[in-house]
Every structure is written in structure tokens, then in C-alpha cells.
Amino acid sequence: MSIVMSLVGVVVLLFVGFLFSNNKKAINLRTVAGAFLIQAAFGGFVLYVPVGKDILKGVSDAVYSVIDKANDGIRFLFGDLANFKMGFLFVVHVLPVIVFFSSLIAVLYYLGIMQWVIRILGGALQKALGTSRTESMAATANIFVGQTEAPLVVRPFIPTMTESELFAVMVGGLASIAGSVMAGYAQMGVPMEYLVAASFMAAPGGLLMAKLMHPETQSTQDDIITLPDDPDKPSNVLDAAASGASAGMQLALNVGAMLLAFVGLIALINSMIGGIGEMLGYGDAALATAFNALQQAAAATPELQAAFNGSLQALAEQAHVAVNALAITEVDRQWVIDAFTPLQQPELAAASKAVVDAAAAHISLEMILGYIFMPLAWLIGVPWNEAMLAGSFIGQKIVVNEFVAYSYFAPYLKDLADGGQIVAQTGVAMSDKTKAIISFALCGFANLSSIAILLGGLGGMAPSRRHELARLGMRAVVAGSLANLMSATLAGLFITLS
């Protein structure tokens, strides 16, 4: 059944892209079919075929090895903080890795290695799909760098691109992530294999949705022989490393500031929504009632009381308060879920489930997004009992951004023994298939705030196209999101088959 659901999801995503097309008769079947086949074939090779899985693991291990070298610099700056003596610290273990990878990529660009790889892969995409060289090069560059850096490889041609080419460049940037932030996601616990696979699948996936929603109707420039030199090229390797580190620091500061602001704003919104929810019968009152009922059920026998007290003690320790000072409505709802889910005594099963359900039912922005995007998550292959949680992450990624979504998703990637979170609707850890689907679905810059980034980046390179960029921005977010969801659906399909 899950295989059938994944296939249905693929068809529906293609149909949605077709519905959004601005010229259905002009769709080039060779380009669209070829892009889909490349995206699916690559996903199948690295997620299903044993040799491909081994290659993907080798690449991922190599990237992890490079990240480990970044830790030497982190330890030099932060000392024992880098050794997790105070637990996982985002500002210590993630943001510096972004700086390191930005510097490394700048060095690879200076040495010409990145251009060589982009030229080969971009040329292959061009020949396979019949797309122009400019959009193929930009799509390939997005595998390695971000939405503002990738267009630099075709910067002189942006003012004269056709509208379809410009749209493809926009979608390519939104469907992918930068290599520097990919390292940051890996440090948060997202499997590197999934991040690498998603980055490569984003190139054909972005072109697929771009050419489905905005097919080419004009003649294109297809006479680019070599990639243009960067007029701001560093004078030597050291200059490249330094400029890359500076750019990485700016990116890391932006990421840190963004997370601080958005997580705080989400907490504020949740507080406001929670008050409204309590008036509607949700929230604290329902949780307190369910908890009191569990207390009464546990008082029936000493054995039940001991089991209840054990869970209560674990909750108090997590909240850093004494048991007699613990107020069930004032602690983190996820802690309540984790503490009372393990109560397996038949006499307490119903009452403890009521507590877990009441804690999970607390109205929040994440819950609202979960219900809105729940059908979409189910459509791309997430089991129904995990679809609301998955839908919440997808919604956060589109409405806020992928870094915030990954930060809320990361605890579910851990083993329960290492402090991982339980899915409230199932009472157990998240399934491996759902972890994979969400990892792929979130792996892209396609969100509302990225429209402003595109306007600033591409608009600065071609001020004459700023009006078109603004007009196409929302459609590009839709296309980029569809590309991410297609990769996620295919990943779920091949993981199920394997």
C-alpha cells in the first residue's frame, strides 16, 4: 500500500505542476520526462541499488571527515565547549561549520575545481534535457552553492535570459541548499546521505518543475563555451580562504539571528494561540483534568503508584524541579508525552494515553500547520499516524524556513536512549521511512522569505529584471517546493522497496 501511495504522490505532484503551467501546450515532453527520469534514476541508484548506496555512503563519510577537520578549529576557539561537555550548543557546533565550509568552497572555486565539475555536470544536463547551457549550468551550481552564489556562474547572461530561463534559475536556487548550510544540517543530526542525495536530485527536480510550470516559448542563447571569470576573483588561495570565511561568518550570523528571532516569535505566537485554545477547551485545563484522572487511577494499588511515581520523577528531573513543586501545565508538553507514554500497565493505559493526547492537543502554530499540511505529507508517503507531525515540519519550512523546520525535526532523529522524542500520535519513535521523507522534503530554500533573497541577489545582478523576479517569486516557491516534495516522495518509494 505504501508503494502505491508513493506512486500516487508522484502523479499528483506532476499534475499540480501541470495545473500551474502558464502555457500547457508549450511543455517540452523531452525536457520534463528526461528531468523526471534523471531525478528518479539518481534517487533509485543511491537509495536502492547496493553499489549506489555504497557510493553515497562513501561520499557522505568523506564529507563527515571534512566536517571533523572543522572541529579542530572549533575546539581551538571554544575549548571544552566543543567536546559537548555542556551538551549540544547550536552556536558552537553548527554555526562555525558553516564558516569553515564557506571558506573551503571559496578555495575550490579559486582553484577551478568547482567550475570543472559544474561544466561537466551542466553539459550533461543540457544534452540530456535539451535545456539551454545557462540554466543547466546554474542548476548544477546549485548542487554546491546557494541561491545567491549559483547565478554568478552565468551572471553576464542574466539580463538577456528568456523569462523561462530566468524562472529556471530561480527555481533551481529554491529547490536546493548551499553546501555550507548542508554541513550545518548534518551537525544537527540530519543524515548526510539524505542531504547529499537531495542536493543532487534538486538539479533535475528543479528543472522538471520549472519547465513544467513555465515552459520555454522564446529563442535562447546557447552559445556559452566557457564559464565567465569572476571579476572579484581573489588574488591567491589565502585571499580566497579569507573571503570565503568572511562570507561564511556573515551567513552564520544571519542564520543565528534568524533562528533566535523566529523561534522566539513562534513561542510568542504559540502563547497567544494557546490562550485562545484554552478558552475553546484545549490546553492546560484538558491536560490538568487528564493528569488528575491518571493520579486517581494510579492510587488504586502500590504497584501502580510506583509506576506512576517513576514517570513523575523522570518528568521532574527533566524540568529541573522537585516532584512536589511540579505543575503539569507549566512544563514542556513534549516532556509530558515522553514521561507518560511508557506506562504499560493495563490499568493505567487509558489514563496515561489521555494525558499524552491532552499534551499533544495543545493548540500551537506547529499544530495548525500540521493539520493544514497533513494531507500533503500523507500524499508523499508518510504513514497517516505520523502525517500531522510531518505536515507541521513541511509547513514550517514553507512558511518560515528550512533551518527552523530542521531544528524542530532534529530531536526526532535521535534514538530514544539518546534523548530522542516520541511521536505523540503513535507513542513510539518516528519510523525510518518518515525520517527519510522529511529529511528530503525540508532540503531546499523554497520558502516565502527566500523571495526577498532572490530579489536582492538576482535583482542586484540584473536590475532590469527585478519586476519579473517579483512577479515570478511566488510561483518559483511553489515550483521549488514541488521539486523538494518530489525528491521526498521518490526517496520514500525507494526506501520502501529496499
List where the protein language model places each region.
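Transmembrane helical segments that form the transport core of multi-pass membrane transport proteins
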Residues: M249-V423
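Hydrophobic core segments of alpha-helical transmembrane domains in multi-pass membrane transport
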Residues: G9-F20, A35-L47, L95-V107, S176-G184, ...
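Alpha-helical membrane segments and immediately flanking helix-loop junctions
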Residues: Q126-A186, G391-V478, L482-L490
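N-terminal alpha-helical transmembrane segments of multi-pass membrane transport
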Residues: M1-V94, D239-A242, L259-A267, L304, ...
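Juxtamembrane inter-helical linkers in multi-pass membrane proteins
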Residues: R119-V153, T220-A240, Y282-A288, L365-L369, ...
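Long, contiguous bundles of hydrophobic transmembrane helices that form the permeation core
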Residues: F200-N254
